Design a protein with these regions (language model features):
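P-loop NTPase catalytic core of nucleic-acid-dependent motor ATPases
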Residues: 10-95
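Phosphate-sensing "switch" segment of ASCE/P-loop ATPases
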Residues: 15, 159-168, 175-254
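Conserved RecA-like P-loop NTPase ATPase core
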Residues: 53, 85, 133, 145-148, ...
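Pre-Walker A (Motif I) flank of P-loop NTPase domains
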Residues: 63-68, 114-116, 166
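AAA+/P-loop NTPase substrate/partner-engagement loops
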Residues: 73-76, 83-129, 195
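Substrate-gripping "pore-loop 1 plus following alpha2 helix"
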Residues: 98-103, 131-165, 210
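Conserved AAA+/SF3 P-loop NTPase catalytic/coupling segment centered on the Walker-B
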Residues: 115-146, 174-185
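A short beta-strand-to-loop transition that corresponds to the Sensor-1 phosphate-sensing loop
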Residues: 121-124, 147-154, 164-176, 192-193
Length: 254
């Protein structure tokens, strides 16, 4: 018998929360606002990486979401970026696991992954399920046929399992030699490990223990972003200059 993953309950949004979320979404300086909220939550620097991770999680709602692999040496800050981004996303929009077995994704409910964020803190945790993840990213769905026996007659029969995507994948890794095919389907981000960034992190950690840096507003900021995510609706986008966009033709990946 397949145990289903229990989806978190979606809290009822108050009028105050809704207005705050709409104010965020209609801010002409939305991207700087997002960066400021990351900083308010204690994550310094990494401006480009912050925006890429945030937008990749928003892309879960698109027909072909982005996937991100955050790479760094141990204790260099990849997990901080990973956690800070997910805290801005509604709990019901994400599935977080430490590891996946080879066929675990096939036995989820049909729509349990659809337009969700699949987050695994270390790439090694998905090594057994890498084939399923590649299929999910390239085809947007999974299907599995399993041979079983009928309990009453003992006759063989085939059971079919189908799981619909798409899904946005968020991973971290310390390895340079991970699954190349999986990495090819992700945007690989390198965390800043320069001394200046380390010094800024140390300063932020010291400030966190002062009265002004106690972080009392952090939960308010997270709630505002989560409510904003719940208000997002699908809208068509037209790029007037799309025909003028060009890319290198001597490489298939950049």
């Amino acid at each position: 018998r397949v145990a289903r993953h229990r989806q978190p309950d979606v809290p009822v949004m108050t009028e105050l929360e809704r207005n705050a979320a709409l104010e965020l979404l209609t801010d002409p300086q939305l991207l700087p606002h997002i960066l400021a909220d990351y900083a308010a939550g204690g994550l310094v620097g990494e401006e480009t990486n912050k925006l890429i991770c945030y937008l990749a999680c928003v892309s879960r709602l698109l027909p072909r979401p982005l996937s991100v692999l955050i790479q760094s040496s141990s204790a260099a800050g990849k997990t901080a970026l990973f956690e800070a981004t997910l805290q801005f996303m509604p709990p019901e929009a994400q599935l977080r696991w430490s590891a996946l077995t080879s066929q675990s994704l096939y036995y989820l409910g049909r729509d349990e992954l659809k337009h969700k964020i699949l987050a695994v803190a270390e790439e090694e945790g998905v090594s057994e399920a890498s084939y399923a993840l590649k299929l999910l990213q390239s085809e947007g769905r999974l299907s599995l046929a399993v041979a079983t026996k009928e309990s009453d007659t003992g006759r063989g029969r085939t059971e079919h399992y189908e799981v619909e995507g798409p899904v946005a994948l968020l991973l971290t890794t310390t390895r340079d030699d991970g699954d190349g095919e999986l990495a090819n389907r992700c945007l690989t981000l390198s965390v800043n490990e320069q001394p200046e960034q380390t010094a800024a992190i140390h300063q932020r950690q010291r400030a966190a223990y002062t009265r002004d840096g106690s972080g009392s507003e952090a939960q308010v900021v997270r709630t505002r972003h989560q409510c904003a995510q719940r208000l997002l609706e699908p809208l068509g986008v037209v790029i007037p200059w799309a025909e003028e966009l060009t890319f290198r033709t001597d490489q298939t990946r950049y």
